[in-house]
């Protein structure tokens, strides 16, 4: 990453967990403008892989969260669930999918977002433990860092993974190499936000934005039926009070992490 840029400058990020369905989008739209004002947020990063009915990203839902304040949208294993994604993902510079899909996948696994005098790199990878088969996320991040580290002042990584152990391993693997590593996918915010020994901010999972009384956003009765019958069940999004999960990352003038705090709003 680049060296310190002269002049006083503190950069604040709002990094938001998986937004689930219509209620998630409405909750995102409700809280993000308020938080941007309250915390003087400069850049909003959000995982959007569940914004279209809980599965995937549509053109309409992507535009909606951009209008609500998202600057960069990451994703995960549900990125392809809406067929229309392939018609526009290559035209969206700040919508990224896991970089460790095999060569030839539409879209990109990282982006560089310019903000004032800074270039912000964001990398998205998927874990492999209890997840669909993918290329190695550790090797893929190394490959991307070689390509972009000299272009970027700040680098954020979203590891979309099931296993906390894999996310923690990625955090320590990248400690001192990137600014921040956040986990997504499990939809439950973890209480382990910290600054690692070499200065990288880390949290195992950001949590989700969407229905609170649910099984990861899904109607709990659907989930119970699935577990009891071991047969396919049509999942529907839950309704009721919502939860909003995110972190605020504050960087000092030299791009080091000044603070890394969780945000959790429960409307129940």
Predicted regions and their residues:
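Acidic, metal/ion-coordinating pockets
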Residues: 2-268
């Amino acid at each position: 990453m680049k060296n310190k840029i002269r002049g006083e400058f503190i950069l604040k990020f709002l990094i938001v967990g998986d937004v689930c369905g219509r209620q998630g989008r409405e909750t995102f739209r409700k809280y993000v403008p308020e938080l941007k004002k309250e915390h003087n947020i400069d850049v909003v990063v959000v995982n959007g892989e569940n914004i279209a009915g809980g599965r995937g990203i549509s053109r309409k839902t992507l535009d909606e969260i951009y209008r609500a304040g998202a600057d960069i949208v990451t994703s995960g294993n549900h990125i392809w669930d809406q067929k229309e994604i392939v018609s526009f993902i290559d035209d969206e510079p700040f919508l990224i999918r896991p970089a460790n899909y095999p060569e030839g996948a539409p879209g990109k696994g990282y982006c560089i977002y310019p903000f004032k005098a800074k270039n912000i790199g964001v990398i998205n990878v998927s874990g492999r433990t209890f997840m669909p088969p993918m290329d190695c996320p550790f090797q893929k991040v190394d490959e991307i860092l070689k390509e972009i580290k000299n272009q970027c002042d700040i680098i954020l990584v979203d590891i979309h993974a099931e296993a906390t152990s894999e996310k923690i391993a990625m955090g320590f693997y990248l400690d001192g190499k990137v600014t921040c590593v956040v986990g997504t996918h499990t939809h439950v915010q973890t209480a382990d936000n910290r600054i690692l020994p070499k200065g990288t901010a880390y949290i195992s999972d950001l949590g989700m934005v969407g229905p609170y009384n649910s099984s990861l956003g899904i109607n709990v009765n659907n989930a119970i039926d699935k577990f009891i019958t071991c047969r396919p069940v049509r999942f529907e999004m839950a309704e009721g009070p919502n939860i909003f999960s995110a972190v605020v990352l504050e960087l000092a003038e030299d791009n080091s992490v000044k603070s890394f705090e969780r945000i959790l709003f429960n409307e129940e």
